[in-house]
C-alpha cells in the first residue's frame, strides 16, 4: 500500500496545480468515487458526477475571478489510514473588484485568497475512492501599517493612547 501512496502522491503533485487550467486526468479515481464538497454542500458518487462537479467548480472559479492561480501549500501522505491530504490556496482578482476599481494602477490589494483542505482516500487497488473537500476560508490579508506620524499626532493631541493601559492594582 505504501507504493500506491507514493505513486498517487507524485501524480497529485503534478495534477493539482493545473486543476483549473487544463483537463484533469480522471483515471486516478475509481469508478465509484465519492466526492464530498463542503463548499457547495454536495455529495456525489460516481466518476461521471465527480467530473461534472469539478467542471462546475472550475466554471464558478473562472466566472468569479478575472485572474487566479492555485498554489499547493502542502501535500502529505498518511499510510496509517491510506490518505493523502492537500492544503491549497486559491489566489485571484474578483471580476467585480476589477470593474469597481478599474482606475487603480496597483491592484495588488484587490486580490483575495481562499484556503482549502482536501483529503483523498485510496482503495486497495491504489485509486482514489473518496475526495473530501473542506470549506474554503478567506485568508487574512496583511493589515496596512498605521502611519507613525498620524499615531504620534493623535497621541500628542490626547485623542489616542499609544497602548491600552491595564490597571491591575488600584491606586489608593
Curated annotation (Swiss-Prot):
InterPro entries: DUF2358. Pfam families: DUF2358. This is Uncharacterized protein C6orf136 homolog. It comes from Rattus norvegicus.
Amino acid at each position: 500500500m505504501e507504493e500506491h501512496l507514493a505513486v498517487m502522491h507524485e501524480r497529485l503533485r503534478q495534477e493539482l496545480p493545473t486543476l483549473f487550467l487544463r483537463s484533469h486526468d480522471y483515471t486516478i479515481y475509481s469508478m465509484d468515487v465519492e466526492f464530498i464538497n463542503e463548499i457547495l454542500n454536495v455529495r456525489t458518487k460516481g466518476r461521471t458526477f465527480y467530473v461534472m462537479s469539478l467542471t462546475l467548480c472550475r466554471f464558478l472559479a473562472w466566472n468569479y475571478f478575472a485572474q487566479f492561480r492555485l498554489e499547493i501549500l502542502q501535500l502529505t501522505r498518511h499510510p496509517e489510514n491510506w490518505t493523502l491530504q492537500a492544503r491549497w490556496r486559491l489566489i485571484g482578482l474578483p471580476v467585480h473588484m476589477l470593474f469597481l476599481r478599474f482606475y487603480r494602477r496597483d491592484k495588488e490589494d484587490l486580490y483575495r485568497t481562499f484556503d482549502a483542505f482536501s483529503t483523498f482516500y485510496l482503495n486497495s487497488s491504489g485509486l482514489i475512492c473518496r475526495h473530501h473537500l473542506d470549506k474554503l476560508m478567506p485568508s487574512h490579508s496583511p493589515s496596512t501599517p498605521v502611519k507613525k506620524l498620524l499615531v504620534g499626532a493623535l497621541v500628542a493631541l490626547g485623542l489616542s493612547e499609544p497602548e491600552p493601559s491595564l490597571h491591575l492594582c488600584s491606586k489608593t
